Each structure stands twice: as structure tokens, then as C-alpha cells.
């Protein structure tokens, strides 16, 4: 599902930033709920309002399933991500289970219907998410959006998960018992080093049980900075019902704007 690769790519061009908050209250989610489900044929569509790119666009993710990728010499779970932007098109993402966390491989492409890595090296985000996401977890990771190409920047991130007592409302519906992840991101190297200016961002991501990511908000600077990016779920298609978008226990019937 869409996370922050597109945001990172946009921000490095304009050198901009993102935010978070905390929650308290009783959390009633099923302890066995999956907050990042990746079942074959699941589909998510998001609308993206990007002030840094000065654009609004849609992103659709579809789970293809487990595949062996000869070019990378590994087996992973493949998700296809489609951006309705010029020169964007369809891109594969691969998820790997490693040490209790998911590793996310992106920056990949299709060449004659086969997954290939770019010449400059793929983007690899270890410790992307815990395999079993729960509130009150903390972890850190480092992201290389353009691989380890000389002159490229990197992002050091610290994450903490919280229970979300309030319903989360997006175009796809109202979702209860969500988990919110607050991420503090420090951008350095590459263009930031050349301008002698590092960048500190904060992200908030909301995950709904058995649905996955339903909203991301990015703010410039710290938690009180101006909003720069907003990503919201407009359509979710579960494996059991591919004919129409569905949402699990929601207080309002889902809408289907995309």
C-alpha cells in the first residue's frame, strides 16, 4: 500500500516536510486483526492531495501474491501500484518477512512483464512495519529512497504506534479501532547536504483492522507544522467480494469516489 516513497520523491525536489499526535482511551480491536493484510487480489485505491507536487491524483494497489523474482534472486509478496500521473504508470513493490518485520522493496520496474531493479539500485526499507502491528510499539529504520547511489539522500525514521479511540473518516467510510503510527523522519545527504540543510518531518498513518492503511497525513516541520500531503482511502476491495468495494465494520456505508 502507498506509504511515503512518492512523498519523499516530491519533497526532495522542493525540500519541504510532515506531523503526529497521541491518543488515550479504550481500544477494542480484535487482538487477531491484521492491520496490514496482503491477501492475493485485495485492492486499495487512494486519493492523494499533494501541496509539494501541486497535484491531486489517485493511486491503486493490487496484491499479486508470492513470486520468485529471478532478477533479484528472491521470493517475496508482490503488490502492483498504479499512479495516474504522467510517466508514472504501473510499478511493482515486494514485501519480505524478515525478523518479525516487513521489508519493503520499491523503485522496481517491469521489463517485458518481468520485475527488474533499476541500474542505480533498488530502494530497500527494512523494518517497514512489524508483522503483527499493535499499539505501543517503537522501532527505528533507515530508508534509502534511491538506493545507495553516490550523492543520494537517506531518511532516518523513528516510529511509535498508538491506539486511535476516535473513528477515522475517509471517503471509503468510517473505521473504528484503528492504529495510528507517528513517524519522525530526518532527511540528510544528497540534495540536503548540497544545500547545507537537513529536513525533519513527521508523518501520521492510520491503519484499520483487516483493511490496512486508510489515511496518511504529512506536515512540514514538527507536529504543528502546515499540512503538505494527505492520502485517503477511497475504495477497498476485499478478496471475498471483488464485484464492489467493501469495508469491514464501518459506521457509514462506504463511498466509491476514486
Question: Where are the model-predicted features located?
Answer:
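C-terminal motif of bacterial Sec signal peptides marking the signal peptidase cleavage site
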Residues: 17-20
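Bacterial N-terminal signal peptides that target proteins for export
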Residues: 1-8
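Short, linear, compositionally biased motifs with a strong N-terminal bias
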Residues: 11-12
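Conserved functional acidic sites
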Residues: 22-258
